[in-house]
Amino acid sequence: MKPIAIFQHEADTPPGYFATWLAQEGLPYTVVRLDAGDPVPQHAADFAGLCFMGGAMSVNDRLAFIEPECALIRAADAAGVPVIGHCLGGQLIAKALGAPVVRHTLKEIGWQPLYPSDPALAQEWLGPEVPERLETFQWHGDTFALPPGARNFLSSPLCANQAYVIDRGTYAHLGMQFHCEMTPELVRDRSRSGAEEIALERQAGRAAGVQAPAEICRNVEQRAAQLNRWAARLYARWVRGLKG
């Protein structure tokens, strides 16, 4: 099988549990370190699937790799190659396929609840016993509209579009606003490196969706384990459409 290409935008946003899950399933992958200067590949058909990770930047920033990534996503869509995106990655898919990505009125940082907005679609991607409330990890200040043909199936009280599917029949693209790839170590590292951002948001009176570092790290082993259980179901559904 061809490898899955994973696009990493920053040193502290690695593929985390996604890479662990792929290895457990015996699925080959390669990491494109955009933060280290790796070029964006030109041919989507060289890969079984594409995965885009998060990052502190915006898809609207004038960075050298943004438009090549968007072009690769469009090429993947045309070639029948499924794409999955985590946070910034979900925004990249939305932008590439024709939806606006804008600055949100507030940030979501930390553990936040999500609720199924399309129960039937949520069951398809998360299993028949999907609960009424899921806890997921968030760290974003932008939000996306839905691209043509997309269906959203998870929402939060602070940000409506949290997980969408573009079903192409034999494969599907999955865009997520949240981070289901987080491990306990990544959560702890992010809470430390982002402590100043958290403090600024809370001091400015924008604390509605922003948790303090101590709360982010509370029961992190159990929270991350449950998060990864949901991630495994999402990933298992997505890889059903891998090409070659």
What do these predicted regions represent?
Residues M1-V81, Y115, A204-G244:
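N-terminal beta1-alpha1 cap of cysteine-dependent amidohydrolase-like domains
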Residues A5, T30-V32, C51, I84, ...:
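Hydrophobic/aromatic beta-strand patches that form the interior of the parallel beta-sheet core
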Residues P15-Y17, P41, D61-L63, A94-A96, ...:
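Short glycine-/acidic-enriched loop or helix-start segments at secondary-structure transitions
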Residues A19-W21, A64-E67, G98-V101, A150-N152, ...:
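Short, glycine/charged-enriched secondary-structure capping and boundary segments
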Residues A76-P100:
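Catalytic nucleophile loop
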Residues L97-E185:
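Pocket-forming structural segment of enzyme catalytic cores
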Residues F153, C159-G244:
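C-terminal and late-domain segments of enzyme folds
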